[in-house]
């Protein structure tokens, strides 16, 4: 993956400033990014439309003959709905992963980043192990975490979940990861993927 990752949060209609997005413009922008060497994209199952537009982009690349599927890395997320947390099961988890595979026209997901809305709700570890089972089935290459604090990340590591990354908000304004998270992650070979580094455009618009 690249050290600079192309975030796709704003592809979601809910997050787009204009209220809608011209997907053709987005795909053209993706092509320009790849031509400049920025080949890693970050999205999520809950970014409405983001996985679909990345899927169209993947098909465009395949059709061009200039790139192989492995030349592009797509990181997605598994974010179970809050009301599902108390009753989540393997069927639900596999269904979401299968949907992401279909949307993005991939044989396997490069990285699935697991987010759990409320650490007080039981089921987080069981769901993480379900992702491991899907990895063993070949549907997921790598498992990462999203917005896990140090304690939650430690639970994953201690339980043997093969965590390769954790995405966390980190900027000159929000330096919470420096307390314990960055050091713990580094000690265990876990990459930290920072988002919000420009504070949503407050620090710089470009």
Q: What positions do the PLM features span?
A:
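Acidic-and-aromatic substrate-binding clefts and catalytic sites of carbohydrate-active enzymes
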Residues: 44-53, 81-86, 118-122, 171-176
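Short, acidic/polar
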Residues: 19-33, 86-105, 149-155
């Amino acid at each position: 993956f690249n050290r600079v990752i192309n975030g796709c949060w704003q592809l979601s209609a809910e997050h787009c400033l204009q209220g809608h997005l011209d997907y053709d413009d987005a795909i053209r922008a993706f092509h320009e990014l790849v031509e400049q060497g920025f080949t890693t994209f970050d999205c999520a199952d809950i970014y409405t439309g983001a996985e679909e537009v990345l899927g169209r982009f993947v098909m465009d690349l395949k059709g061009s003959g200039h790139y192989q599927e492995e030349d592009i890395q797509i990181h997605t997320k598994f974010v179970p709905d809050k009301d599902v947390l108390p009753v989540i099961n393997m069927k639900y988890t596999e269904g979401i992963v299968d949907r992401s595979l279909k949307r993005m026209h991939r044989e396997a997901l490069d990285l699935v980043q697991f987010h759990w809305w409320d650490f007080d709700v039981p089921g987080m570890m069981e769901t993480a192990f379900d992702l491991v089972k899907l990895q063993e089935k070949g549907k997921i290459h790598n498992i990462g975490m999203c917005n896990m604090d140090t304690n939650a990340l430690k639970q994953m590591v201690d339980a043997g979940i093969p965590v390769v990354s954790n995405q966390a908000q980190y900027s000159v304004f929000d330096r919470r990861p420096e307390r314990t998270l960055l050091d713990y992650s580094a000690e265990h070979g876990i990459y930290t993927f920072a988002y919000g580094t420009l504070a949503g455009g407050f620090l710089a618009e470009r």
